[in-house]
Amino acid sequence: LVADGRVTVLDNTNARYLSASMLPYMPDVIVCDASFISLQKLLPAALGLAKAGATLVALIKPQFQVGKGLVGKGGIVRNSALHQQVVTDVVWWLETDMRWHVLQTMRSPITGTDGNVEFLLLARKPE
């Protein structure tokens, strides 16, 4: 993947501080599998730099979205109501604050570390 000229590698870059000067062009696809930070804190800069019609594929990890007091032993969120609330909150944020259209969410067929339930999200930036 690194050898593909269409891919911009930004290793050791804090995505919260992405700027247009760091990218050779406006991205048309953003893929996010982040840990230890919520999507709401991590993605605004990248989403703002994306071109109209861009696609977002993100992994929602409830253990990094809920408050520390709601994460169980071993860093696992076991409450299915909390899972749904996290997905609802991320969708609301993307659609309301970021003005992206969420096309689909689904439970990831692959569990996270130690069985954490995670969710995939597909969204598109309006034309």
Protein language model regions, located:
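Core SAM-dependent methyltransferase catalytic element
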Residues: I110-E127
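Short "lid" loop at the C-terminus of a central beta-strand within the Rossmann-like core
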Residues: A15-R16, P62-V66, P109-I110
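Short alpha-helix
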Residues: H83-M98
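Conserved S-adenosyl-L-methionine
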Residues: R99-P109
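S-adenosyl-L-methionine
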Residues: L1-K41
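Short, glycine-/aromatic-enriched active-site segment of Class I SAM-dependent methyltransferases
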Residues: P62-N79
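Residue-level signature of catalytic and energy-coupling elements of molecular machines
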Residues: I30, K61, G115
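A short glycine-rich, Lys/Arg-flanked "PGG" loop and its adjoining helix->strand segment in the class I
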Residues: Q40-V57
